[in-house]
Amino acid sequence: MIRRQQRSTSFPYTTLFRSLSAESIFVIFAIYKNKIHETQFERFYQKLQYSNTFFTRSLMQQKHWESRLIDIRHHGYSDSYIKIHYIMENRVTKLFNIKYPIIQGGMVWCSGWRLASAVSNNGGLGLLGAGSMHPEMLVEHIRKMKEATDKPWGINVPLLYPEIDRLMDIIIQEGVKIVFTSAGSPKKWTPLLKSHGITVVHVVSSALFAKKCEEVGVDAIVAEGFEAGGHNGREETTTLTLIPNVAASCSLPVIAAGGISSGKSVAAAMTLGAEGVQIGTRFAVAAESSAHPAFKQRVFDTDEGGTMLALKKLAPTRLIKNEFFNQVKALEDAGAEAAQLTELLGKGRAKKGIFEGDMTEGELEIGQIASMLHKEETVAEIMEDIVADFNKTMSKLGDLKL
C-alpha cells in the first residue's frame, strides 16, 4: 500500500514537461516499499496522462506500460519515502542513442580516449578533443576509443584548427559517427559530414548563430553561456539568459553548456528549454582526464572570483588568474593590439598549463564552476552523482508552489 504523502501527489508536471519535448518523458512513476497495486498505478497513470497538455498519448502504448508494471512488481523498495523516478527519452538521447542526456565537452588536453570512453560507458556521450591533437594522434585516440567502448561517442573539432582538412578526412575515413564543431562557421563542413552519415552538432553563443546553424542543416545545438571555460562567446551572455533565447529561436534540440556540473544545474537547464547538457569543467578534473595533477589541484583551489575572460581581442577565453593571466590583463589594460597579445600568447600555452602542469606561465582554461569542485572523482562517480542529484532535485520541486 502506498503511504500517502504530499510529495507523491505534488509533482511539478508543467515545469518538467515545458522544459522537454513532448516525447521526452518515457515514464514517470512513484514506488513505495514492496509492491504497487495495479489499480493504484493505473490511477497515477491516468493523472499523468490527463493532467497536462504536453504529454504525448502515443507513448502510452499498452505493451510499454505492461512491461513497466512487470518490472515494478519484481523489485522491492525499502525506502521510507516515496521516490519519483524519471526515465527520459528525448530528442537528445534519441539522436545519440544514449541513456542520459549528458555530453562530456571535448576539451583540449583533457579529453582523450580514457575520459571519453568512460563517459560513454557510463551512459553519457564522450567526446574526444581534437583541438589539441595532431592528425596522427587523433587516429590513435579514435582507434583506442573503438577498443574501449561499444557505446556511442564523438569528436569535438574547432573549425579554426590549422589542419582542419586533414582532421575531417580522418574523421570520415575512420567512420566516426558524431561530430561537434565549434569556433567557426559550420556552413562549409556540415553538408560534407552529413553526406557521410555523420551527426553534426555546433556550439553557439547566441540565438542568431543558432538560427544560422539550423539553416545549414546541423542536427542539434550546444548553447554555451558566459560561465564556460576556455573559448567563449563575445556576447558574454549567461547560460540562464542564453538557453531560453536559443530554444525559442530554432526548432533544433538544444544542449546547454556553461556553469553546469550537478543534477541541480541539469534540472535548471531543462526547465529553461534544453533537452541535454554538455559538461566540461567537472570532467576536466576527473580521474580519467589527461590533465596534469597540478592543474586539477589548482582548479580545486579556485574560488568564485578565480577565473575571468581574457584575450578578448583574439578569442575570448576564460582562464584561472595566474601570472600568465596577469601579463595578459596588463597588456589589455594598456590598450595592447591583437598582435602584441598574439606575441605574448605564443604557442603551446594551454598545453604548458593543462597538460604539463606549469601553473605560473601556462594558460589555465576552466569554467566558473571550478569553485564548486574540491576533489578528483571517477567518471562513474560523477555520472552517478549527477543522476541522483537530478532525481532528488526534481522530487523536491514537487513541494514548491507560488
Label each region the model flagged:
Residues L48-Q49:
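Arg/Gly-rich low-complexity intrinsically disordered repeat tracts
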Residues M1-L16:
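Short, small-residue-biased leader/transition segments that mark boundaries at the very start
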Residues A22, V27-A30, E38, E42, ...:
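Short hydrophobic alpha-helical segments enriched in small aliphatic residues
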Residues H74-I87:
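Short, Lys/Arg-enriched N-terminal segments with co-localized hydrophobic residues
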Residues H85-S249, P253:
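Active-site entrance/lid segments in N-terminal catalytic domains of soluble metabolic enzymes
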Residues G233-I255, S261-L402:
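Conserved active-site-proximal phosphate/metal-binding subdomains
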